[in-house]
Amino acid sequence: MKMLRFLLYILCNCIFFTGYSQNSIISEYSKELKLYNFSDPNPIPILTSNNKIYPYFTFDGYEKKSSKKNFKIIKLENDYIKVFITPELGGKVWGAIEKSTGEEFIYRNEVVKFRNISMRGPWTSGGIEFNFGIIGHHPSTATPVDYIIKENSDGSVSCIVGNIDLPSRTQWRVEIMLPKDLSAFHTDALWYNPTPLQQSYYNWMTGAAPATDDLEFYTPGNSYLEHSGEEKKWPINSEGRNLSKYSQNNF
């Protein structure tokens, strides 16, 4: 009987410790990355090339040789995953790792190579990018944004990134929150128009993941928008391709 009670005691404690999750943790540190930087701003007003994003200016020069630069990294971590955020690169989710395997499920690009892609010019691949305003990669996608970090009462942690969109005078915020007991993180976007004027803009996110032929996209909806704003069918397009399968995106 004593042996039975002892075994039950051990079993109950094993169940308790197995089901217990420590609080998520959040930290800041600097990491040296290889950088292909962009130039000083173009002194010619952007009114001559793209007046939709005035008063922003453009960056037109790009380095061919790399250098090293320290970037601030915000790390959110629980028992299951790590999430990395870069406030100096538009506040993007830089990458995410599943801890038991060490595999990335959000692509973390260790090389910051700016090239002429966004509305102001510089853009770099990888992670999850937040875009608000005019259709295109947001003007602040390659430059620092505001951020704060929080430890929440439920054991989760949050990093909130945000900025002002100058053409519309609107303000955007995105909270990246990591619960203590989930192998996933949440994003919660807020877009605030402090002006008395109604304005028609849009919000979109670009996410990067390591791509193989067996990659599939599980996302709701029955249509999508092209860069031009034209609506198309999802996931089966007009050519009969199932666009939710990466292997059928070979155009």
Label the model's feature ranges.
Residues 1-23:
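Bacterial Sec-dependent N-terminal signal peptides
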Residues 2, 20-21, 70, 153-155, ...:
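A short, polar/charged loop/turn motif at coil->beta-strand junctions and beta-hairpin connectors
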Residues 22-46, 51-57, 72, 78, ...:
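Extended effector regions of multi-domain proteins
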Residues 22-43, 114, 122-143:
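N-terminal short leaders/motifs
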Residues 23-27, 101-129, 149, 186, ...:
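Polysaccharide-binding surfaces and accessory modules of carbohydrate-active proteins
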